[in-house]
């Protein structure tokens, strides 16, 4: 079984599915000039739990080592990151996933030294680039697979250029995840892209094992990606037009979906026509990831279904027709499972 270490904000201890995958877990804090280990790694923010759930989507049988260094506000200290990496150097895993970064170069040399030692030991390190930045650590180190987000048609797609400073691009399209308070939200950006890449690497290791030149294998699989940079843009998603047939407008469930959207998203009557004309991400509708998550939760409650979270992202639910299609597809899937 592949062992992935996640250095982040911990995991939600009430999520029994993810907790069942944890082989060991602890937190590292900083106090009075020293790093302190504690047998507590409950996620107070949700970020680490999101990363674990993403990795699990690609590699369901993965074993997790959880190291909590980020607090409720997703803040942490470089000293704790360095200590976590030293721990993993002496207690090896297969993949180290770090959906985090620092732009403080105070510990650049010390962080670089331990990353080099880990690389030479054969472990694979993945780190996200800081959002909206060109340089952050440890993503820029030669022995670390630095990841930044991009728009891909499928979650499994990625691009790998080992000769570049930031070697990898993964899908940053926000996907549905469950928060530590049980509500739904969307998780995207470079952090999500790095979790995607960590999960993909874990699945490849599970399938092929650690080869002498894993980089070549990783590069080969990236060649299957078909990226459409010209047509797949945030602008095209937001400004996409919606075509709705008259027959669909008369469908009972479709009418109910419209009512739920208007109520949950608090769309005023004067703007309700936008639901039928464009993406529900249109700026005039003022939809954010929190009330978008409430919408998904309410649809599940009303139809007594459970969406498969890996199917729900801002491409699959970009407008009312795609939400309706996903709803009907989920109904059919759950009916066939009975």
What are these regions (language model features)?
Residues 223-338:
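Phosphopantetheine-dependent thiolation modules in NRPS/PKS and related acyl-activating systems
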Residues 2, 8, 17, 134-206:
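Extracellular S/T/G-rich loop segment that most often corresponds to the catalytic His/Ser-adjacent loop
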Residues 37-103:
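Subtilisin-like peptidase catalytic core
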Residues 209-231:
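An often Trp-containing, charged/polar helix-loop segment at the C-terminal end
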Residues 65, 124-126:
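Structural detector of well-ordered beta-strand residues that form the stable sheet scaffold
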Residues 1-58, 62:
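Active-site core segment of subtilase-fold serine proteases
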Residues 97-101, 128, 149, 195:
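A cross-family glycoside hydrolase active-site/sugar-binding cleft signature
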Residues 1, 76-97, 108-121, 132-146, ...:
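Mature extracellular/periplasmic domains of secretome proteins
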């Amino acid at each position: 079984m592949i062992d992935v270490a996640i250095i982040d904000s911990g995991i939600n201890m009430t999520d029994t599915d993810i907790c069942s995958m944890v082989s060991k877990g602890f937190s590292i804090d900083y106090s009075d000039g020293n790093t302190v280990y504690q047998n507590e790694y409950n996620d107070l923010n949700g970020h680490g739990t999101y990363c674990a759930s993403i990795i699990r989507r690609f590699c369901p049988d993965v074993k997790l080592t959880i190291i909590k260094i980020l607090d409720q506000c997703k803040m942490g200290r470089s000293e704790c990151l360095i200590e976590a990496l030293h721990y993993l150097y002496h207690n090896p895993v297969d993949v180290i996933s770090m959906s985090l970064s620092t732009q403080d170069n105070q510990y650049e040399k010390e962080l670089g030294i331990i990353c080099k030692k880990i690389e030479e030991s054969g472990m694979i390190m993945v780190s996200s680039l800081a959002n909206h930045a060109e340089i952050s650590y440890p993503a820029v180190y030669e022995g670390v697979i630095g990841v930044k987000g991009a728009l891909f048609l499928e979650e499994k797609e990625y691009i790998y250029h080992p000769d570049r400073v930031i070697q990898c691009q993964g899908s940053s399209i926000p996907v549905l995840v469950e928060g530590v308070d049980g509500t739904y939200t969307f998780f995207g950006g470079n952090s999500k892209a790095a979790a995607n890449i960590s999960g993909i690497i874990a699945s490849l290791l599970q399938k092929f094992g650690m080869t002498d030149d894993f980089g070549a294998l990783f590069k080969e699989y990236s060649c299957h990606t078909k990226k459409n940079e010209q047509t797949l843009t945030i602008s095209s998603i937001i400004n996409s037009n919606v075509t709705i047939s008259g027959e669909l407008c008369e469908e009972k469930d479709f009418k109910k979906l419209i009512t739920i959207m208007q109520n949950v998203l608090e769309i005023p009557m004067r703007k309700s026509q936008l639901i039928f004309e464009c993406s529900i991400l249109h700026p005039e509708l003022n939809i954010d990831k929190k009330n978008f998550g409430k919408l998904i939760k309410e649809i599940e409650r009303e139809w007594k279904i459970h969406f498969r979270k890996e199917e729900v992202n801002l491409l699959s639910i970009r407008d009312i027709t795609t939400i309706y299609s996903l709803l009907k597809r989920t109904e059919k899937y759950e009916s066939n499972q009975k």
